[in-house]
C-alpha cells in the first residue's frame, strides 16, 4: 500500500476513534467512567486504536505536526498494556480529558492548513 494512503488511513482511524472516545465519555466524570466496566473497556479499546495508529505513522509525518503530543500517546500506549491499577486509571482519564481533545483539535487544524497530509492519493 502506498505510504500516503496508509498514513491517511491511520489518521482517519485515530480521528474516528478519538470522536468515539469523546462520545462515550461525554457527561461522565472520572469516577463514573472508571466504575462503568463496559464504557471503560470500550474507551480503553478506542484509545488503544488511536495510540497504535499514531505509533505506526512515519516520523516525517509526525514532524509535520509537531503540536501533537507524540510522546504522550506513546506513554499512553504503554500504560494501556497494564491489566489494572491506579496508573491505568490515571492514564485513561488523562487521555479522555486532555490527550484526545487536543489530538482532535490539532488534526482539524492540520487538515485545514496541510490538506495534503490527509489526501487519499497515491
Predicted features, each with a name:
Residues 1-122:
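Solvent-exposed interaction patches of small proteins and small membrane subunits
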Amino acid at each position: 500500500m502506498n505510504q500516503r494512503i496508509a498514513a491517511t488511513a491511520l489518521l482517519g482511524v485515530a480521528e474516528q476513534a478519538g470522536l468515539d472516545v469523546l462520545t462515550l465519555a461525554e457527561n461522565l466524570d472520572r469516577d463514573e467512567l472508571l466504575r462503568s466496566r463496559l464504557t471503560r473497556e470500550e474507551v480503553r479499546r478506542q484509545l488503544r486504536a488511536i495510540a497504535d495508529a499514531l505509533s505506526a505513522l512515519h516520523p516525517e509525518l509526525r514532524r509535520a505536526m509537531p503540536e501533537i503530543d507524540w510522546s504522550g500517546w506513546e506513554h499512553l500506549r504503554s500504560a494501556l498494556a497494564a491489566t489494572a491499577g491506579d496508573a491505568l486509571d490515571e492514564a485513561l482519564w488523562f487521555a479522555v480529558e486532555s490527550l484526545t481533545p487536543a489530538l482532535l483539535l490539532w488534526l482539524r487544524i492540520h487538515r485545514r492548513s496541510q490538506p495534503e497530509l490527509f489526501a487519499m492519493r497515491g
